[in-house]
């Protein structure tokens, strides 16, 4: 049920993104969509490490884009369209209601004892998490991890070089 909700909200933010015309509003929608996609990948992988790293990479790119947009865009205010917001909330609530009515197990999920369920889930998560992390750092996938580390280092060096005060595209105009 959680995945269906995230899929629906990702679809709605994608539709809203096409209707935006201000760069800061588009950046906000892109950040919200990045959070949703990171949550979806974490739910699919049973470990949130990969989605956390993915979110940090996207957030670093978004910060660089935010610097460019704030230095180049005008100082006009932006506001969300009330019509678009109400339509998206209506669609999202309809998907939620239809999902609850069609999926009877989602109703029994709210009736269960939450304390015992959380203890059981924590125990299962700890057992599966150690196996997933071993798979991440063993032979076939350790090359991908090293490649990701090198990519992040090169990106960090490039961003530092680009954002020097008197060199590059971010220098002040006189």
From Swiss-Prot:
Reactions catalysed, semicolon-separated, are: a ubiquinone + NADH + 5 H(+)(in) = a ubiquinol + NAD(+) + 4 H(+)(out)
Annotated membrane topology is:
Multi-pass membrane protein
Top-level EC class: translocase
Listed as disulfide-bonded, the cysteine pairs are none
What's a single GO CC term here? mitochondrial membrane
A single Pfam family it belongs to is Oxidored_q3
- Please verify whether the record's keywords include Cell membrane: no
Q: Which InterPro entries match?
A: ComplexI_Subunit6, NADH_UbQ/plastoQ_OxRdtase_su6
Q: What is its main location?
A: mitochondrion
Alphabetized, the UniProt keywords read: Electron transport, Membrane, Mitochondrion, NAD, Respiratory chain, Translocase, Transmembrane, Transmembrane helix, Transport, Ubiquinone
Record EC number: 7.1.1.2
Q: Which GO terms describe its molecular function?
A: NADH dehydrogenase (ubiquinone) activity
Membrane-spanning residues where?
24-44, 48-68, 82-102, 143-163
Q: Where in the cell is it found?
A: Mitochondrion membrane
Q: Which family does it belong to?
A: Belongs to the complex I subunit 6 family.
Q: Which PANTHER family match?
A: NADH UBIQUINONE OXIDOREDUCTASE SUBUNIT ND6 (PTHR11435), NADH-UBIQUINONE OXIDOREDUCTASE CHAIN 6 (PTHR11435:SF1)
Q: What does this protein do?
A: Core subunit of the mitochondrial membrane respiratory chain NADH dehydrogenase (Complex I) that is believed to belong to the minimal assembly required for catalysis. Complex I functions in the transfer of electrons from NADH to the respiratory chain. The immediate electron acceptor for the enzyme is believed to be ubiquinone.
The name under which this protein is listed is: NADH-ubiquinone oxidoreductase chain 6
Write down the species: Ceratitis capitata (Mediterranean fruit fly)
């Amino acid at each position: 049920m959680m995945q269906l909700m995230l899929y629906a909200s990702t679809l709605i933010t994608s539709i809203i993104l096409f209707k935006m015309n201000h760069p800061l509003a588009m950046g906000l929608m892109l950040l919200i969509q990045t959070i949703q996609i990171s949550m979806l990948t974490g739910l699919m992988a049973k470990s949130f490490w990969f989605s956390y790293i993915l979110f940090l990479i996207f957030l670093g790119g978004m910060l660089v884009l935010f610097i460019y947009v704030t230095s180049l865009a005008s100082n006009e205010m932006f506001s969300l369209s009330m019509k678009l917001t109400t339509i998206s909330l209506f669609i999202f609530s309809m998907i939620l209601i239809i999902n609850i009515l069609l999926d009877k197990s989602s109703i029994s999920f709210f009736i269960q004892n939450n304390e015992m369920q959380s203890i059981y889930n924590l125990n299962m998560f700890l057992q599966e998490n150690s196996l997933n992390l071993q798979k991440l750092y063993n032979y076939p996938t350790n090359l991908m991890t090293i490649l990701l580390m090198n990519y992040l280092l090169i990106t960090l060096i490039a961003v530092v070089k680009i954002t020097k005060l008197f060199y590059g595209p971010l220098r002040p105009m006189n």
